[in-house]
Amino acid sequence: MNSSLTVQRRGSDAELGPWVMAARSKDAALSQRDGVLPVKVEEDSPGSWEPSYPAAWPDPETSRLHFRQLRYQEVAGPEEALSRLRELCRRWLRPELLSKEQILELLVLEQFLTILPEELQAWVREHCPESGEEAVAVVRALQRALDGTSPQGMVTFEDMAVSLTWEEWERLDPARRDFCRESAQKDSGSTVPPSLESRVENKELIPMQQILEEVEPQGQLQEAFQGKHPLFSKCGSTHEDRVEKQSGNPLPLKLENSAEAEGLNSISDVNKNGSIEGEDSKNNELQNSARCSNLVLCQHIPKAERPTDGEEHGNKCKQSFHMVAWHVLKPHKSDSGDSFHHSSFFETQRQLHEERPYKCGNCGKSFKQRSDLFRHQRIHTGEKPYGCQECGKSFSQSAALTKHQRTHTGEKPYTCLKCGERFRQNSHLNRHQSTHSRDKHFKCEECGETCRISNLFRHQRLHKGERPYKCEECKKSFKQRSDLFKHHRIHTGEKPYGCSVCGKRFNQSATLIKHQRIHTGEKPYKCLECGERFRQSTHLIRHQRIHQNKMLSVGRGAHACNPSPLGGQGRRII
């Protein structure tokens, strides 16, 4: 059996998917820049493992979720469970494609996202970071946004699709910066005049007129209006419907606010706040730190060549052009016409618009993955496969069991950085941290209670008596939309929550939980006076009144009559 150094492509680019293609192209380009040819040591053995049907494999993130969410109850036995885990892990980490360092980076990145606070996890995962450095940069950008720091002086580049200060950009390896620009230009198939590129690098001011003069002699202006030039990207959004493609505050070198085409002749028409200035300020040059992307340039196109005609052109232009810095390209396009800086954003857009084939037969809710449907159906069936070994309490989700077990172990993994107090759950830490940051909360003028802005409006309805959600059947009104949905089940007779033991069905999940205690014998409510336990809180309250009445009767007997030294008359002690 001979060993040889081979450079082999396993499958076509379409089979590998955008995630693996991006990782391979970046690593290969950087290696070639350093004069190193990436090779892979393989054995020329007919029995060497090859991936089966790679074209049918899901993307690595989906495989990771399947690997982490696989449950023993879903397989026939321990052998199948181990085999499934090995196959899912191979589909996730793809050892035949990625190096050991890349696999380690994936594992470290996953653990980093896992230990993030819950409020940060969702935001960071939405940006699909492909390395630990990208994840750190996204977290830092979010922290700056939450702290209210100004985004001025920031620059965005395609390789990371996150915001960096000019100082951080300048500290990057020059080879990495050059690679980012060269890769962006290769992806777009166009180049930018060196004179303009150098001026952007030096943070100089460039009027729109000079940009047009530099681009037009090269025959690229028409390409720009067709969306082929890296200076521009074309989208199908309207001026009113335009939404930001990246979360957080708008970044400089990008006009995040779409401007009306009418009366807009140069970039200088947009001030630092992203708004359009008057005619007198047309000659003012835009600071690089201003918010300068998504600037509608339709005004520069001759009317005969404009893609739409009539009055709707200024309000609903289907081919509006948006100004973008040339090292911040948007090469990935979705079916809706929107362009994205990074393949991960394009993948997120694709997932948002793809169909949800797995539908719940009880409530009609749809899901993209079968595993999500299985978890959802436990709400209706009342199934709780995860049991606590200490007290026997069961849960429908493994995460809920993990949180519950901390009550037995005493583990408190969440620490307040300001006072050092520890908590079992992240939500408890968040609630505690609000006591340190009262200035970020809003105070109710009626009762003085402080709460977040999202809860303030809901809280104020308690004082106003406002009930904006009305039932069309019986005209009954409710303060919360969720209460109206629950009430509708009375009229429709819908009972989506069924007991898995006796088959009895209920219209509310809380009622099902109370009913299941009959089968499990669970009595979570304990009287502190006598130690007696109850299944429902209402039973405990009724029982506590017995102790209260006894205390009142004993108090009246001891203090009802007290001999008076004045005349032997009794007096009542109040």
UniProtKB/Swiss-Prot annotation:
Polar residues composition-biased segments: 265-274
The keyword DNA-binding is annotated on this UniProt entry: yes
Mapped zinc finger ranges (C2H2-type): 358-380, 386-408, 414-436, 442-463, 469-491, 497-519, 525-547
Domain KRAB, first and last residues per copy: 155-230
PANTHER family hit by this protein: C2H2-TYPE DOMAIN-CONTAINING PROTEIN-RELATED (PTHR23235:SF178), KRUEPPEL-LIKE TRANSCRIPTION FACTOR (PTHR23235)
Species name: Pongo abelii (Sumatran orangutan)
Gene3D superfamilies per UniProt: 6.10.140.140, Classic Zinc Finger (3.30.160.60), DNA breaking-rejoining enzymes (1.10.4020.10)
Function: May be involved in transcriptional regulation.
Domain SCAN box stretches: 64-146
Positions bearing the Glycyl lysine isopeptide (Lys-Gly) (interchain with G-Cter in SUMO2) cross-link: K40, K203, K228, K254, K282, K443
SMART domains: KRAB, SCAN, ZnF_C2H2
UniProt-annotated location(s): Nucleus
UniProt-annotated stretches for the region Disordered: 182-202, 231-284
Any one GO molecular-function label of the UniProt entry: RNA polymerase II cis-regulatory region sequence-specific DNA binding
Record PTM Phosphoserine, positions in chain: S12
A GO CC term attached to the entry: nucleus
Keywords: DNA-binding, Isopeptide bond, Metal-binding, Nucleus, Phosphoprotein, Repeat, Transcription, Transcription regulation, Ubl conjugation, Zinc, Zinc-finger
CDD domains registered for this protein in UniProt: KRAB_A-box (cd07765), SCAN (cd07936)
Name of the featured protein: Zinc finger protein 394
Entry's family note: Belongs to the krueppel C2H2-type zinc-finger protein family.
